[in-house]
UniProtKB/Swiss-Prot annotation:
EC number(s) reported in the record: 4.2.1.47
Family: Belongs to the NAD(P)-dependent epimerase/dehydratase family. GDP-mannose 4,6-dehydratase subfamily.
A single BP term in Gene Ontology: 'de novo' GDP-L-fucose biosynthetic process
Function: Catalyzes the conversion of GDP-D-mannose to GDP-4-dehydro-6-deoxy-D-mannose.
Residues annotated as the enzyme's active site: 133, 135 (nucleophile), 157 (nucleophile)
GO terms assigned for molecular function: GDP-mannose 4,6-dehydratase activity; NADP+ binding
Domain of life according to the entry: Bacteria
Source organism phylogeny: Bacteria, Pseudomonadati, Pseudomonadota, Gammaproteobacteria, Vibrionales
Descriptive protein name: GDP-mannose 4,6-dehydratase
Cofactor(s) the protein requires to work: NADP(+)
Length: 372
């Protein structure tokens, strides 16, 4: 019998990579996607299987973390061996604008899943993975951050995720469920949402290089982050559910860099050298050298990075650096893709899209505008 996995957030970055990973291991993979007026399955279209075909291994269900009856029905139908709760309102800035919705999805959504598993009598047979977040550490109390570091959340998103973290621990201890938290530090890929900072950088600079945009507007470029590749991190998520006993783990690389450095690497992949001048809101990124033919729209002296105060958070998280030593010692997990390799991959994918759009624009066609 194939193992069955249920993934919430299957159409997102992590969900799509995890679905690929589990399918390669012979799982029957069920994913929950939200109803929308337009298709939102681009990240999983390449693994789509016709549900009318016998023995389909990848099945999508309409669902929502805000609807307990819906979640209960799906769990009752699938009876999964493993549940990966990756669905969330995961944008920190958006959580300040929509705090109640963020709490309903990220905090209560986790509770709804756990309670449905318990009420259906699956608590002894279904393993549960919760995608937790390094944003729990917020105003960091120690560096690097490990599993025992105290939490100090600094956004409605982080507060909602803290509730989810502790309700997972509570159900594990109260009902003997195999339920665990993976405290994920920042992880990226070409499938990262376009409004997240790394993808905003790679997509924005690729568009600027092709003449589709004029400038990349940033917030806090001094912020320090521990970045890894989503492919490495979903492998760790699976490993966490293959142990005899459930435990919580930090998932990180143990190395940190600034947002400014990520901008510099991205520009370099386009053959562009940037120099930053000025301080605070007056800081600018200026082109000082160009090599190759990947940035035909740029010339030396162009200002391509500026600060927009709108992108500063109400409460900043200045530094995040994970300590993955427990994951390495207990599970043998180490990341295989470096942050520089990941950055190069992201830039090249966004450059391909920008080049196509530039060609369309040249021939008089409309092209998509950038999103903030």
């Amino acid at each position: 019998m194939k193992k069955k996995a249920l993934i919430t957030g299957v159409t997102g970055q992590d969900g799509s990579y995890l679905a690929e990973f589990l399918l390669a291991k012979g799982y029957e993979v069920h994913g929950i996607k939200r109803r929308a007026s337009s298709f939102n399955t681009q990240r999983v279209d390449h693994i789509y299987q016709d549900p009318h075909v016998d023995n389909a291994s990848f099945i999508l269900h309409y669902g929502d973390l805000t609807d307990s009856s819906n979640l209960t029905r799906i769990l009752q139908e699938v009876k999964p061996d493993e549940v990966y709760n990756l669905g969330a309102q995961s944008h920190v800035a958006v959580s300040f604008e929509s705090p109640e919705y963020t709490a309903d999805v990220d905090a209560m959504g986790t509770l709804r899943l756990l309670e449905a598993i318990r009420l259906l009598g699956l608590e002894k047979t279904t393993k549960f993975y919760q995608a937790s977040t390094s944003e729990l550490y917020g105003l960091v109390q120690e560096t690097p951050q490990k599993e025992t570091t105290p939490f100090y959340p600094r956004s409605p998103y982080a507060v909602a995720k803290m509730y989810a973290y502790w309700i997972v621990v509570n159900y594990r201890e109260s009902y003997g469920m195999y339920a665990c938290n993976g405290i994920l530090f920042n992880h990226e890929s070409p499938r990262r949402g376009e409004t997240f900072v790394t993808r905003k950088i790679t997509r924005g600079l690729a568009n600027i290089a092709q003449g589709l945009e004029k400038c990349l507007y940033m917030g806090n470029m001094d912020a320090l982050r521990d970045w890894g590749h989503a492919k490495d991190y979903v492998r760790m998520q699976w490993m966490m559910l293959q142990q005899d006993q459930p435990e919580d783990f930090v998932i990180a690389t143990g190395v940190q860099y600034s947002v400014r450095q990520f901008i510099e690497w991205s520009a370099k992949e386009l053959g562009v050298t940037l120099t930053f001048e000025g301080q605070g809101v007056d800081e600018k990124g200026i082109v000082t050298a160009i090599e190759g033919d990947k940035a035909p729209a740029l010339k030396v002296g162009d200002v391509v990075v500026q600060i927009d105060p709108r992108y500063f958070r109400p409460a900043e998280v200045e530094t995040l650096l994970g300590d993955p030593s427990k994951a390495k010692q207990k599970l043998g997990w180490t990341p295989e893709i470096t942050v520089q390799e990941m950055c190069a991959e992201m830039v090249m994918e966004d450059l391909k899209v920008a080049q196509r759009h530039a060609l369309l624009k040249l021939h008089g066609h409309d092209v998509p505008v950038s999103v903030e």
